Amino acid sequence: MALTDQTFLQLITRLAHEMNDCVALEATTNGSTTTFVDNVNVNASRESYDGWEIFFTSSPNLGEIATVTGTSSNTITFTPALTSTTTGSTAILVNKRGRGFRIQDYKRAINGAIQDFNGTALIPTIETISPVFDADDGYLTVPADLAEAYRIEYQNTQGRWLEVKWASRAGSDGWTAEPSAAVIRIEGPPADAANGYTVRIHGYKRQALLSALTDTCAFDSGGIVARAAYLLTRSALDRDPKYAQQVLLYRQEAEEAMSRLRVLRDPRTRTVRN
């Protein structure tokens, strides 16, 4: 598995470029609360961006979305008003001539692709649990994204990580999982040994859906973009015939990527959360 850790912003930008629906902007001089000036990438005599979406990719307007209402010389006018743009501000334009896709479409498609990949692949992880293990309680709450576990360890006073043995059935000495309750129980002498110590779980997790632009995705970015592009083109078949050929290409590319992401599980792996 390629752990590329691409941010939500990087995936959105890459997907928009993949769909040939993106113009990258960088302000060459100060603008205003409703204008963006780019002497390099904006040329009104060559292309009008009226009706496109402008998506700001740097502070102070990071993540803001506006609609282009005018293109004049090297200047784009947009609404609603935001913080004044300054030299070096960056943004992308999407929804090409009203026939492309909006930023919210790209976000939904990327998260849809992640959900599809989660049905096929999981991500190796080590999750440290807080607070420390309490033998009187006898259980650990499984982290929300963790799906499977194969090894439990506690850290002793010397800083060494020692394995908690696996129990073949509930009530036996060692650890067992209750997926329906999303807990791992440690019983008997192993529980006494781990009492009061930090515990960590080796296992496999699901990729969380992305929300903040800084959120990251550990799945192969090429596969996620291909799957998201497939979802977008499939949804737009009745809008533009050009997507008919693209949808087949992206479906094949995404399926190949998903097949590469399958992880060989440790033989001790147990499901810990349904």
Model-assigned labels for residue ranges:
Residues M1-I65, T69, T75-T83, T90-N274:
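Glycine-enriched, solvent-exposed interface loops adjoining structured elements
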